[in-house]
Amino acid sequence: MEQQQSKNIVHVSKLFVCTAVDCKDDIEEKFERSFVTLQMQISGLSDKEMHDMLSQAVCKDKQHEEISIGFLYIMLTDPSMAPKTYRDVTLVSRDGMNGIVTNLTFLVAEKYTKLTEVARRQLIWLLREFVKHQVLSVENVIWNCLRQAGGGDVSSRNLFLIESLLDIFIEFRTWLEGNPFLVQSTVYSFVRLIEDHANPALMSLRQKEVKFTISLIRERFHDIIPLGRDFVRLLQNVARIPEFEQLWRDLIFNPKILHQTFNGIWQLLHIRTSRRFLQCRLLPEMERKISFLASSVKFGNQKRYQDWFQEKYFATPESHSLRSDLIRFIINVIHPTNDMLCSDIIPRWAIIGWLISSCTNPIASANAKLSLFYDWLFFDPAKDNIMNIEPGILVMYHSIRNHPFVSSTLLDFLCRITKNFFVKHEDKIRIGVYNSLKLILEKQVIPNLQPLFESPKLDRELRNLIRDNFREFLSPSANLGQLLYPSMHPAQGYIIKKESDQRILHCENMDLHETGLINTSGSNISMLDEDIKISLVPTDLEIESVFSDETAENLKRVHNIEENTDDDDDLPLSKVRLKEKPRVELAESIAESFDAFVTKRNSYTWEAFLKDFRPLPASAFEEFQLNYVISNTVLILRETLPQQNIFSESKTEEKHLAKSISYPLYGLFRFLYENDEKSKKPFQILLSEICEGIPEIGYLLLYFMKIYCKLQTRKNSQHSYQFKTTIYRQICDAVDEKIGNCLIRDLDLLEKENTNIFLWLLPDIYREFKSIATNNTDLLRITLRCIDAKNVRDILYSVAQGKLTIFKQDGLIDCIRESLDFETYEQFCLWQIVQAHDVPLRCIQDLLPELEAGSHPEALSHFLLLLKNEEPTNEIIRLMLSRETKSKGDPFVTSALRFWCQRYEEKLSEIIASLLTSKYPSSSPNKRKRPPKGISVSTSTPSADQVLNHLEHYRRSCRHGTGTGLYVHDMMQRALQSAYSHSNDSTKKQFSDLFALAAEEDTTVGRRGGSGRGRKQPGSKKDVSNHGTSKKNAEMVKTIYSSDENSSEEDWSKSKMTQTAKRRKKANNDSD
């Protein structure tokens, strides 16, 4: 009946703002339902009756929560009833209002934007009451309210929340200072918010914020220090305010005045700011949206999400400052997993590139770039995370091809900020940037820096700036090229002034040059990156500004050449140089063919020239003639290679394959393939210069031979065309390097250029360069770093079919030993390939003593699987027991012994017993101890203590008698007895429980005296005796492990040892 009445009640929410299209979610329905339920319960009751009824109802957890939420609803929606309701809550609450605080925290975090105006004002009133009465956990609600005080938002609603929180902090300052984390969050938030309140209409609010924040910083500076480097970044944005200017001076010149343990601003810069503080400057809703974009949106489908985000959060001029907060959050908080990195989800660098490139405010743009590179300036590989510097390099690296303007502005900013951010500590900042770039290369975030630092799309000034700042990361040829050819584009050499000269940092108002720290706040920065457009085609004004008519003519000539070419590559300049070279008379035998090659530039004319040139001796050329031929040849071969798609699109279609090797350089390879005779010196010099001028020649030759042999074999099926490694050796000889080094270098370059072609060539490499490639760790690492699950599958197929042999048994152990420091995924792939080669365990078992549980889990896992398919042998057991034992034992050895005990218990027991017995001298002085059969003398032979340690840890692993049969066999019993009799007191004490498993040894003299040399004991009696002994041993061991929980193993061992000692004493007396 009551449910039917509640359904008929039409209730309009007074807590949430709802439109006609909004659907209520579970939270909203929960609050509404609790309010309606409470109203139905207390309607028409007096205060006393209501208190009595609620006091009984709150005893049930479910009703207690409903009543708490209902009261919270009333306090947030009815200002007149709120004080009385608060008193009622304090009377009936049985958890110190913890339930109300918890629900209020959740409400603020998830639904603050949907609260009505009345509810928001009542929220502030309720917070004030909570703080006044020091309700527990109210700081959680305050912290979530701070998060809702958004940056870049000067709307009246947001300003009301900011000022209300500020008033609470000022009024209850003592309470605030009692919570260090809340002090830190408050200071961090208000320093960020002050930046947005520069409008004269907000001056009174800003002054109140400044006064409160400065006093809190100075009085609680020991709590402020953990805020770290991002706090300094925020202080830069408010440095022009007089109070903060004085704080800056104290930070730099008089740090002890702030706190005795504070040593200066460099101490703050080396503290990484906690993620919680970076998170608190993003609205919870904004955080959810940006996290969704970085974790669920596919790369290429992000535009509509970015447009929505732009319209939602960047619609006002003040909102541009949010970009820095977002970039810092993405860099330090959003760290994608390996699965996400390998997926097609939009990467972090793409989001950051969008945030920077879409910014139209110069000041906000400079701050955004500083946020991107901020961790670079103080990077310490020992403490900092590479994920914090990865987006910076990737956004530049991936933008250089299609968006060179983004890369150039970021590179320019990085170069300038390295020098100007903190002049006093410029050397330390350079070390931080150097460490960043070095780790980026070590971890192979990008293959190398040359495509970025040496890109022809960068202007001359920026290339010079890069060379000055990052010379150690440039290739030697780039440094030499800068000296020989200062400008990659001829037109740039004549431009007198470019707008990029204006990209400098200006500091006004505060003389931060004397402090050594720049200021990137407000109007203090003039960054004109957005307006820079460097044109390679000079204007009429630029032509008029040159110094002479001759210079103008040269410029116009270059201009005409550039008009018909692509600005993005360097071909025009090469053609100009070629045309400007003076013509040199050559020998008649090559003059005609060389001219034809220079004119037509195709493979046919090139091979014809080579046929004429090869037999010529050195005497046929003057030095300048040979240099002329070589320089023109190398230039043409370089120019005629395609800049992109150098490899075939298809690996099967003859048309695509033939086209991919139709360029003149491949004509050289074809000529060498078809002509095996020894070359003259000029040809060798030409070949050497071609190799120097075209570093890719090695892997292009391998690619050519693969395709050429395939095509020729198809044309002539009766003749099989094979790789000719002699041609590759000629290339290696031309550069004066060993073939092994050349092969690894070329394959490394090929893998970075095109992984699919590298894997396609791999079987041929291992077949034709068998002696070099097999068991080659360097080649193996190149292969493992680029393969995925499908590639591993294909490699295993090739191995199984006999088309690919990566390992051979001899020397494999050294290869695996060097691979132990590979990445986990690489090692798992390696072991699958090893298993596909059917490598016997004996070839690699010597590694067993070297593997450590903490450092080599991948290898130990595979070895354990191999051992499960093997029978225990003397050699394997010797190697396993030679492993170092830790205090907690060796789980690897224990696991192997446990599964062997299930099938080979007696054999295993005999092997271990023989190994243990061999560690002690023979009991008979007249007999020389002979090593047990199958045990070889080796440096890996375990000591007696090692064997006992492993047996002891194995004993501890046994429960309720399982696996204890290892100790009951006669050989093991005698071995333990021998070990006991030859051990010192400390060893006996250490392994007392293990020795207690040995049955009492019968007197040797009595046993031997009872039988004559020529007599043989009846077999039945011996069998019965042995059976009785084994049964007795088994029962004794079973008794130890099957005892109930109340029995003490140590007490049993002590009593056992006492009994053993008595029996030994009696036996000795009988023997005497």
From Swiss-Prot:
Top-rank lineage group of the source organism: Eukaryota
Gene Ontology cellular-component annotations: cytoplasm; nucleus
Cellular localisation: Nucleus; Cytoplasm
Residues modified as Phosphoserine: S1042, S1043, S1047, S1048
Entry keyword annotation includes Transmembrane: no
Annotated region (Disordered), positions in chain: 920-943, 1002-1072
Keywords assigned by UniProt, alphabetized: Cytoplasm, Nucleus, Phosphoprotein
Principal place of residence: nucleus
Stretch forming the signal peptide: none
PANTHER family from the UniProt entry: INTEGRATOR COMPLEX SUBUNIT 3 (PTHR13587:SF7)
Cited function: Component of the integrator complex, a multiprotein complex that terminates RNA polymerase II (Pol II) transcription in the promoter-proximal region of genes. The integrator complex provides a quality checkpoint during transcription elongation by driving premature transcription termination of transcripts that are unfavorably configured for transcriptional elongation: the complex terminates transcription by (1) catalyzing dephosphorylation of the C-terminal domain (CTD) of Pol II subunit Polr2A/Rbp1 and Spt5, and (2) degrading the exiting nascent RNA transcript via endonuclease activity.
Subunit description: Belongs to the multiprotein complex Integrator, at least composed of IntS1, IntS2, IntS3, IntS4, omd/IntS5, IntS6, defl/IntS7, IntS8, IntS9, IntS10, IntS11, IntS12, asun/IntS13, IntS14 and IntS15. The core complex associates with protein phosphatase 2A subunits mts/PP2A and Pp2A-29B, to form the Integrator-PP2A (INTAC) complex.
Family affiliation: Belongs to the Integrator subunit 3 family.
Protein name as catalogued: Integrator complex subunit 3 homolog
